[in-house]
Regions:
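Extended, low-polarity segments enriched in aliphatic/aromatic residues
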Residues: 1-258
Length: 258
């Protein structure tokens, strides 16, 4: 077998503001040269066909218009435009709120864009050939998630360290992510970047039935099925605030919140 037919993912175990978690599957967004070219959210609220933020108030709609205006300034007025944009953004935070405590840019559980982009990139990688064509069978795909020192809260870049002392590995990235998500204290069925990887597709990422996943561990309580793991004690990561109250498992220990 050609080395080009095998790929590996070595992600950190982290929360993510746009997808809830970033693990094996989300890690491969890094195959692109510049992530600024990738779609991460859609302008507006769900009512208007977007996933930028959940509410439909006039204030939020005005913010969307203002953001578009600022971006046009940056593009059309080089150098000066960037400085003007910095000033406008600083003033805008006083009116519309700062990003660290205001849902915007798709940083919440209603983001319906980033998970799609992520799965598309995974398909490009595991089915794509160097000449731009696609193969009929997927390449082998190994994942080893590093959860020795993980990240919770404002992931993927500004979160808090969380010592877990674990590695989670396997040959099916969706299955590995499902187990990792459960250990984080989250319901994988609430995270599209995980559960949609099991969906039927002409280029499937996983053809595994999640109910057949068998967990092998040196920790006895974690051995067995996903349903059994759900009932055990977890690490109970603090999710990004835009995902709080939506993805936690029923037995999640909220006393860990920061």
């Amino acid at each position: 077998m050609s080395v080009r037919s095998i790929h590996s993912s070595l992600p950190k175990m982290k929360t993510h503001k746009k997808t809830g978690v970033t693990l094996s599957i989300k890690n491969f967004v890094g195959i692109t040269a510049d992530k600024n070219y990738l779609p991460h959210h859609t302008w507006g609220s769900p009512k208007h066909g977007g996933d930028d933020y959940p509410d439909t108030s006039f204030k939020r709609q005005f913010e969307t218009w203002g953001s578009k205006f600022v971006k046009r300034i940056i593009i059309n007025i080089p150098f000066i435009g960037i400085k003007m944009a910095q000033i406008l953004r600083a003033e805008g935070e006083k009116v519309f709120g700062a990003t660290h405590n205001t849902i915007r840019s798709g940083n919440w559980y209603g983001n319906d864009t980033t998970w799609r982009m992520t799965l598309d990139l995974n398909r490009c990688l595991i089915y794509g050939n160097p000449d731009g064509t696609f193969r009929k069978t997927k390449k082998r795909y190994y994942s080893v998630i590093d959860g020795v020192i993980a990240m919770e809260g404002a992931g993927p870049m500004q979160g808090d360290p969380k010592e877990c002392g674990v590695y989670i590995s396997g040959e099916d990235p969706a299955s590995v992510d499902t187990v990792a998500t459960t250990l984080m204290g989250f319901d994988w069925r609430k995270l599209p970047v995980v559960y949609e990887a099991f969906s039927k597709h002409e280029m499937p990422i996983s053809e595994i039935d999640p109910q057949t996943i068998n967990i092998v561990s040196d920790i006895k309580d974690w051995r067995g099925s996903l349903d059994e793991l759900r009932e055990k004690e977890h690490f109970d990561f603090v999710p990004y605030f835009g995902w709080k109250g939506y993805i936690e498992l029923p037995n999640y220990q909220k006393t860990n919140d920061k």
